[in-house]
Regions:
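Soluble non-transmembrane domains of integral membrane proteins
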Residues: 74-312
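Acidic, low-complexity intrinsically disordered tails
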Residues: 33-74
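A generic alpha-helix propensity feature with a strong bias for hydrophobic helices
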Residues: 23, 31-35, 50, 55, ...
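A ubiquitous, low-specificity "background" feature that marks scattered single residues
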Residues: 8-10, 21, 47, 112, ...
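Subset of Sec-pathway N-terminal targeting signals
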Residues: 1-42, 166
Length: 312
């Protein structure tokens, strides 16, 4: 994590804390929005790769094909429990390192329980997706191979490395690096060996299902629920109403994408913004608001991204 990444996280906090205050003070009353009916399911991600300011679209829930290793039986799930000075986290081998629990040591809910930012809706986080050469969507959500740190308290940075075999001898690897005194988790993805099997040569990594409310008065928390993308000095956001579903995709270099609640945020910050092909944000509101974000990256290069999961 370099100085530019630290600066990016600082700017994210400044933008997201002060933008709502500015809008409340200076923005005119919004005109009623005309909402088109859409069918995008938040749990299946975003239609990445569209042009900027993409309109809402109607689409059927896509069938998601799970890749399995052609040479190995399905692997059993492994759970790696980590304790840092700031939080306790549990990482699953599903999807090559999805975070299935993330509870803070210094933040508590109305029942005096540690705030946990992971629930049943957003367990599909940090997942990698792409289309095969036939254009079929691929979700690498099964268990990946892992033989490393078994869990426990960490006093220095600890890297968890996962891999999955797409075809004989061709692997995708993903690593997550944790630090004892930071909410930042560094992510590295190497898909170079499978780039010939990736349609358009790009894959996505994203966070789906947003963050749960943590306030006793959930309605007050929901006011702040949004997803954001920051490109070229411009901030775009998605805020949905009950019954709505919306997604927007933006081509080109991306500084960061984020999902926030009143007090917490999850954000993906590419180490090299120019490496990003496009970014997408969106959300749906049926039983509750849930927001998504993802970035599209080239399989031809190793990609390094920082995840911030913590307080604003």
């Amino acid at each position: 994590m370099d100085r530019n990444t630290l600066l990016a996280f600082f700017l994210i906090a400044i933008v997201l804390i002060f933008t709502p205050m500015y809008m409340e003070t200076f923005s005119p009353s919004p005109e009623p929005a005309i909402v088109e009916d859409t069918g995008l399911d938040s749990t299946h991600g975003l239609p990445i790769g569209k042009k900027p300011n993409a309109t809402k679209t109607v689409k059927q829930k896509p069938e998601v094909f799970q890749l399995t290793s052609p040479t190995k039986a399905d692997l059993e799930e492994k759970l790696i429990e980590l304790e840092t000075n700031l939080y306790n986290a549990t990482v699953s081998t599903k999807g090559g390192g999805s975070i299935v629990s993330f509870s803070f040591k210094n933040y508590f809910d109305q029942d005096s329980q540690q705030v946990n930012l992971i629930n049943g809706i957003n367990k599909e986080n940090l997942s990698i997706r792409f289309q095969n050469l036939d254009g079929d969507p691929i979700n690498l959500g099964k268990n990946w191979s892992y033989n490393g740190f078994l869990g426990g308290s960490i006093n220095s940075k600890e890297t968890l490395k996962f891999s999955t075999e797409i075809s004989p001898g061709q692997f995708i690897t993903k690593s997550l690096t944790f630090r004892p005194d930071s909410y930042v988790i560094d992510i590295s993805v190497d898909a170079q060996k499978v780039q010939s099997q990736v349609f358009s040569g790009n894959y996505s990594i994203g966070w789906y299902g947003g963050l749960p409310p943590t306030e006793k008065n959930e309605k007050d928390d929901f006011v702040y629920f949004k997803s954001y993308v920051f490109q070229g000095g411009e901030l775009e956001e998605v805020k949905i109403k009950e019954g709505e579903t919306e997604s927007q995709s933006f081509n080109g270099s991306t500084d960061w994408v984020a999902i926030r609640t009143k007090y917490f945020i999850t954000s993906l910050v590419p180490n090299n913004p120019g490496q990003v092909t496009s970014a997408a944000i969106g959300g749906s509101f049926s039983d509750r608001e849930a927001y998504d974000m993802e970035v599209l990256l080239p399989a031809s290069d190793i990609s390094n991204i920082s995840l911030y999961l913590g307080p604003l």
